[in-house]
Amino acid sequence: MQKLKQQVFEANMDLPRYGLVTFTWGNVSAIDRERGLVVIKPSGVAYETMKADDMVVVDMSGKVVEGKYRPSSDTATHLELYRRYPSLGGIVHTHSTHATAWAQAGLAIPALGTTHADYFFGDIPCTRGLSEEEVQGEYELNTGKVIIETLGDAEPLHTPGIVVYQHGPFAWGKDAHDAVHNAVVMEEVAKMAWIARSINPQLNHIDSFLMNKHFMRKHGPNAYYGQK
């Protein structure tokens, strides 16, 4: 697990490097599906002092199997998503400014241009709000459930992120670094959408044929973007 712990540590350290977190407001995890174990950031540990050996290993029920710290308070959310979507290899949660602003506004981040379409096939959805009962109960688990309720049976890697109403963004990917990459892009397109709608409040969504082209040339069966 040492290699995965190092990867998760590096991915967590990318969050402040890319300006996605303030203080300790964020976490990254990754899963070893063969072993059924998840590595995640420890709760409340400052990035400035954090080391790879501080990462916490939990099983799929959330039981700590390795580590001296408590795991992130959002661990149950991560585990619920890993259980539901086998294509996920890494998950990120932040409170990055612009994506969180859309979450607080209760609005999906609209697909307005090709930058968005290169990564997200359509709007980045916003969940419904959690009920008082859901919040007072197993809050973090129910956060995962409301994300799943919103995504349904869609392939999560086609829209690798979501904003949870009144909370903030979650992003995911094939591994921890891919998840962070998608979180960075989500914050950037959230900022772009806010600026674009400020300039032109009547702005429509990107044309569907242009969105399809940009997404499929990177992610479709006949993708040709980048090097083989």
Curated annotation (Swiss-Prot):
For molecular function, the Gene Ontology terms on record are:
aldehyde-lyase activity; L-ribulose-phosphate 4-epimerase activity; zinc ion binding
- Give the residues annotated as active site: D118, Y225
What is known about its induction?
Induced by L-ascorbate. Repressed by UlaR.
Name the source's superkingdom: Bacteria
Primary gene name: ulaF
Cofactor note as given: Binds 1 zinc ion per subunit.
Q: Which family does it belong to?
A: Belongs to the aldolase class II family. AraD/FucA subfamily.
Q: Which Pfam family, any one of them, does this sequence belong to?
A: Aldolase_II
Chain's role: Catalyzes the isomerization of L-ribulose 5-phosphate to D-xylulose 5-phosphate. Is involved in the anaerobic L-ascorbate utilization.
Can you cite an annotated GO cellular component?
Answer: cytosol
Q: Extract the InterPro entries matched here.
A: Aldolase_class_II_sugar_metab, Aldolase_II/adducin_N, Aldolase_II/adducin_N_sf, UlaF
Keywords, alphabetical: Carbohydrate metabolism, Isomerase, Metal-binding, Zinc
UniProt cofactor(s): Zn(2+)
Q: What sort of enzyme, by top EC class, is this?
A: isomerase
Residues binding Zn(2+) are D74, H93, H95, H167
Reaction(s) this enzyme catalyzes, per UniProt? L-ribulose 5-phosphate = D-xylulose 5-phosphate
Q: Which GO terms of type biological process are on file?
A: L-ascorbic acid catabolic process; pentose catabolic process
Q: Which pathway does the protein contribute to?
A: Cofactor degradation; L-ascorbate degradation; D-xylulose 5-phosphate from L-ascorbate: step 4/4
| Binding positions for substrate per the UniProt entry | G26, N27, S43, G44, S72, S73
Q: What PANTHER family does this protein map onto?
A: FUCULOSE PHOSPHATE ALDOLASE, L-RIBULOSE-5-PHOSPHATE 4-EPIMERASE ULAF
Q: Which CDD domains match?
A: Aldolase_II (cd00398)
- Name the EC number(s): 5.1.3.4
* Key word Iron-sulfur present: no
Name used for this protein in its record: Putative L-ribulose-5-phosphate 4-epimerase UlaF
User: What taxonomic lineage is listed for the species of origin?
Assistant: Bacteria, Pseudomonadati, Pseudomonadota, Gammaproteobacteria, Enterobacterales
Q: Which organism is it from?
A: Shigella boydii serotype 4 (strain Sb227)
